[in-house]
């Protein structure tokens, strides 16, 4: 959530900043509701002052032996008015909070202004796309020919946008997870965590998925009476890992905190009808290794650069060409103030596709979660960062396509071989 103070002053600059994100700030609404809040605040304070003055007068009357019953009755009436005013103010504050929850984060100053992915800015490239001397096959064809990727079985078991992996492809999927976790924990000092795959609504509000993006989530229902439960399947491990510090006061000496986890992720893909219907690109259930950093305001910019580099290192070790782009204002996620996307080269599509997104959310999530940093007697809001390190299914398909051979086999990247019993190739 953005700083509420920004909604109480001149809203023109804020409106212009949010407009670059495709969000229209209703200035009239916020001015009217702020005037209403001020009026209620003044009314409440005046009534409280009247009650305090009356209480002193009652004391004086009683001390002098005079009758205070009339004044006591008046003060009782004032107390009732105060309760009514406080209830009205509390209700209004809740309305303000709910409305503020719908506002996206403010872009950082160095984020390029744009409306779509076409306006993203390439920062760097690594690796040269391989030149093939045979007809390139996509990962779906490769996996199905090997008999190790089965969409038909997944459709029978569940429905569309699911998959079944078998044999060495399933092993490589597991090997990728192990390699990623080892890299983040051993090389980069992350603390590995095992977190619930089901979270409550407060967790999703904390990281910004609720209330705005409920349609993208899978919500659980009580099968006995069809009542909604306050449980959702996680769309990313960012949600449980970031919420580990919800409501906490963190000692500045302990920061940054660096968490990593491997989890399945569950997304309804409500807004992607007809997109990437073939293959592993866009699934309702997929695996991801996630990175989360909890930091101070002074640390967060540098940590975003480091986190992005850590995700890039995984791709370098797998010898997968990629490019890194800085997202424009109109393409960033709701909670982010700055984001880098890493896009891996897919030979069958002759283009780069997103495989990681690394974001600095500033104090946006921390404000929603109530997470603060203690520095002596001073406290301030923490900064939160998250990044994919990496999306496992997309990494698997990138390995399959970039390391395919003419005979339909797949050369196993050297760093994965220790996790696959020393095998160096997946054969037909």
UniProtKB/Swiss-Prot annotation:
A single GO molecular-function term is: serine-tRNA ligase activity
Top-rank taxon of the source lineage equals: Bacteria
Asked whether the UniProt record includes Cytoplasm among its keywords, one would answer yes
Which residues are listed for ATP binding in this entry?
267-269, 354-357
Q: Which InterPro entries match?
A: aa-tRNA-synt_IIb, aa-tRNA-synth_II, aa-tRNA-synth_II/BPL/LPL, Ser-tRNA-ligase_type_1, Ser-tRNA-synth_1_N, SerRS_1_N_sf, SerRS_core, tRNA-bd_arm
The record lists L-serine as bound by 236-238, 290, 388
Give a yes or no for keyword Aminoacyl-tRNA synthetase in this entry: yes
Q: Indicate where this protein resides in the cell.
A: Cytoplasm
Q: Name one Pfam family in it.
A: tRNA-synt_2b
Gene Ontology cellular component annotations, sorted alphabetically: cytoplasm
Provide this UniProt record's keywords sorted from A to Z: Aminoacyl-tRNA synthetase, ATP-binding, Cytoplasm, Ligase, Nucleotide-binding, Protein biosynthesis
Pathway connected to this protein: Aminoacyl-tRNA biosynthesis; selenocysteinyl-tRNA(Sec) biosynthesis; L-seryl-tRNA(Sec) from L-serine and tRNA(Sec): step 1/1
Look at the named UniProt entry and state the broad enzyme category this protein falls under.
ligase
Q: Which Gene Ontology terms describe the biological processes this protein takes part in?
A: selenocysteine biosynthetic process; seryl-tRNA aminoacylation
| Subunit structure comment from the entry | Homodimer. The tRNA molecule binds across the dimer.
Domain notes per entry? Consists of two distinct domains, a catalytic core and a N-terminal extension that is involved in tRNA binding.
Q: What is stated as this protein's family in its record?
A: Belongs to the class-II aminoacyl-tRNA synthetase family. Type-1 seryl-tRNA synthetase subfamily.
What name appears for this protein in its UniProt entry? Answer: Serine--tRNA ligase
Species: Psychrobacter cryohalolentis (strain ATCC BAA-1226 / DSM 17306 / VKM B-2378 / K5)
Q: Which gene encodes it?
A: serS
